[in-house]
Design a protein with these regions (language model features):
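Extracytoplasmic/periplasmic substrate-binding proteins
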Residues: 13-17
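Active-site phosphate/pyrophosphate- and oxyanion-stabilizing loops and adjacent acidic/basic residues
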Residues: 11-12, 50
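C-terminal, loop-rich substrate-recognition/catalytic regions characterized by aromatic stacking residues
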Residues: 39-201
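Conserved alpha/beta-hydrolase "acid-adjacent" motif
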Residues: 3-10
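Acidic beta-to-alpha connecting loop that harbors the catalytic carboxylate
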Residues: 2-3, 28
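Catalytic histidine-centered segment of alpha/beta-hydrolase-like enzymes
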Residues: 30-41
């Protein structure tokens, strides 16, 4: 699911494999979809049986007539370290990557995040090793306290780039990529990029 650290593997495998394949991404943490949190859960065992019956028993279950990818498109929700349910809806793509795929490039500028590169002048920033303590558990199973909470504490110790408000909404299905040029005055470092939905309040 989207709360699982391996969520990027699904679109990557759908793109890279040439064998018959199906992808399923729900709102879940690293747990079986019939019992995973956050909900909604699905009949995962029944879906698996339809796949196995088709390929192992040559029973026409209709599974291969269905879209290549089914994914949960989450709605905006207030930050919390635990959710019982994630509001949203199921979406489907016949092929992956989809034919109507639209890629956008956004630039990290001094005045925020936008679609025009404004300067290549470096931005200097002293970092703190405590940034990220509230990032949640890397391998969540859906237990209380495992998900990332309010990110304002991490923002206070980070370089932040905020876009204008998306009045028409913005939906992302897939795995965003970040390309950054940087230098450091230390021999080792760690770069973390966060893509956050900012609440209006």
């Amino acid at each position: 699911g989207w709360a699982d650290p391996y969520s990027n593997a699904i679109p990557r495998m759908l793109s890279g494999l040439t064998c018959p394949r199906k992808g399923l991404i729900g709102p879940w943490a690293h747990e079986y979809p019939q019992r995973a949190l956050p909900g909604p859960q699905i009949g995962f065992v029944q879906a698996c049986l339809r796949w196995w019956d088709y390929w192992l028993k040559e029973t026409d279950t209709g599974i291969m007539d269905e879209p290549m990818l089914r994914a949960w498109m989450p709605d905006s929700i207030a930050p919390s370290t635990h959710y019982e349910e994630c509001p949203g809806r199921w979406v489907a793509e016949e092929k992956w990557p989809p034919k109507n795929n639209e890629s956008q490039t956004w630039y990290l500028n001094r005045n925020g995040l936008n679609q025009n590169a404004e300067t290549d002048k470096p931005m200097l920033f002293p970092t703190s090793q405590t940034v990220g303590l509230n990032a949640g558990v890397w391998f969540p199973m859906g237990a209380a306290g495992e998900f990332p909470g309010d990110q304002r504490s991490a923002d206070s110790g980070s370089l932040c780039f905020t876009s204008e408000y998306f009045y028409d909404g913005m939906e992302i299905l897939g795995n965003p990529e970040a390309t950054v040029m940087l230098s450091a005055d230390q021999t080792e470092g760690l770069l973390a990029a966060r893509l956050c939905d900012i609440a209006p309040d």
